[in-house]
From Swiss-Prot:
Name assigned to this protein: Shufflon protein A'
Domain of life where this protein originates: Bacteria
Ranges where the record places region Constant region: 1-361
Species assigned in the record: Escherichia coli
One Pfam family it belongs to: Shufflon_N
Region spans: Variable region: 362-430
Amino acid sequence: MKKYDRGWASLETGAALLIVMLLIAWGAGIWQDYIQTKGWQTEARLVSNWTSAARSYIGKNYTTLQGSSTTTTPAVITTTMLKNTGFLSSGFTETNSEGQRLQAYVVRNAQNPELLQAMVVSSGGTPYPVKALIQMAKDITTGLGGYIQDGKTATGALRSWSVALSNYGAKSGNGHIAVLLSTDELSGAAEDTDRLYRFQVNGRPDLNKMHTAIDMGSNNLNNVGAVNAQTGNFSGNVNGVNGTFSGQVKGNSGNFDVNVTAGGDIRSNNGWLITRNSKGWLNETHGGGFYMSDGSWVRSVNNKGIYTGGQVKGGTVRADGRLYTGEYLQLERTAVAGASCSPNGLVGRDNTGAILSCQSGTWGTIGGKLKVTQLSTTGYLGQFDFCAIARMGNAEDAHYCQVVESPAGSRKWYKYEHKTGCIASCVTLN
């Protein structure tokens, strides 16, 4: 190369290096803008998610918010409220990357106070640049995205709308985000909570939940996997293979062709436990119970004994074998010796506790002491077991005396005499 060409080569090299440096600087700026735009898009998605949660919260609590707001005084919804009610996940942060905090201000519509409208506004933190506000307002997908540039007015993306913050009782500053939720938007949210969706909506289990009774108009529910309910009322039949109940089963009547097995008690409040065909109650474990096989007797299954620490009471008690008592035999009713009785062989007691037995149709003592009574009266002497003449009087006076039981076996004794002086001795067996 000639010496006079060297300067041109150096100049060309420097120019090339300058161009490369300019391209690098330009590319770095483009990359910086790209990264910044992606960050703003992420912020817009977070605002959209927050606004969607606020929209659902308003729809769910529409009536409550109507009662706590006016056309000028808002009901304020915070991030904490949305997290506590499950509309936002517990990990959602209270502030965004710039330290701004989102809140929703809900008021009644001035033209139609029965309707609600709301605005989501960010406050505090570091203001966004205008470029970021314009970009984020366009990227917000829930509600109408906007921004606050003068601290008093919310302006929509592409300046499509403008609303004073004071209309919603909201306060903020320059460089903050605003999202408008119109009356139509919130009415739709309220309807979402009342509409039953046929398919599952991720994150919205409330859309598959009924909040009132449903009338099927006598139509069927077919191909049901499981029916979970607190109670059930059926005017017709219930057909099935098996049934498991952890609580009560109630009905006017029930018919079972085979067996009914209960893990607990079977109770009847006002009715009977009715069996038929010589059946009754049976304890399967021990083989005892009660049944009737005729119209007269309640019988013990397998001739089992009946045991109780209380009383067994009846009109009469009959033992075909021996009658045992582990203590004493107490006869409560009393009889009178000499009174009539039937049948022979009855055992009783008098009022002093002495044992009497029915002998020949008359209550009489069993063993005991003889009581002798001497009587001088004439005529009826009384009731005694036996009477005899104890004294006749004077034989030289041709005196006679007679003692007789009349009628025979009646224990009624009489004394007859010609003159006085005859004494009768009568015996009573105590």
